[in-house]
């Protein structure tokens, strides 16, 4: 492959007391996935925390967050591992903290646990030449390919799809440097860091 990869970002929303800045959010930190390459051990790539306020859009069931009001408060975060809950594939963690009471009415937090995996950066300038070389190897070996198919780009994630849900939602997104650069080039520099936009 290209030797480049991104990170999987696992997210969970929680409550924050705007008076004290107290928050506490639990989630299952992933430890091992199994996919087309076999089992892989997931590497912890850190936790980030953002404070925000969501507002109800009148007359609709939707909530909205002003992206400019999202503030990173990772410096307040502590991660507690519940050792008794650790299994080969996951462990329960609590991300909690206090502080930044000066942030006004921001009464929610967004916790992002990142993981390193060997998945390729599909948006890297090296990706297309690598894939062309791979197809050429098949042709040189006498294998004629009429088409290539994949029902999901991220076949390198995990086959246990429903173990990655929080509150009924698939709570993981793959972000690579190449993807972030493509978005930033097209939509603005603020998209060079995707974590708060998940």
Task: Report the location of each language-model feature.
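Active-site-proximal, well-structured secondary-structure segments within enzyme catalytic domains
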Residues: 168-198
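Alpha-helix termination/capping residues and helix-transition junctions
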Residues: 140-142
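Acidic/aromatic-lined carbohydrate-recognition and catalytic surfaces
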Residues: 1-98, 102-104, 111-128, 155
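Residues that line or immediately flank small-molecule/substrate-binding pockets and catalytic motifs
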Residues: 152
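Extended, H/D-rich, highly charged conserved domains that either
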Residues: 160-161, 165
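Structural preference for beta-strand elements that scaffold enzyme active sites
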Residues: 145-149
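Short alpha-helical segments and helix-capping/turn motifs at coil-helix boundaries
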Residues: 129-138
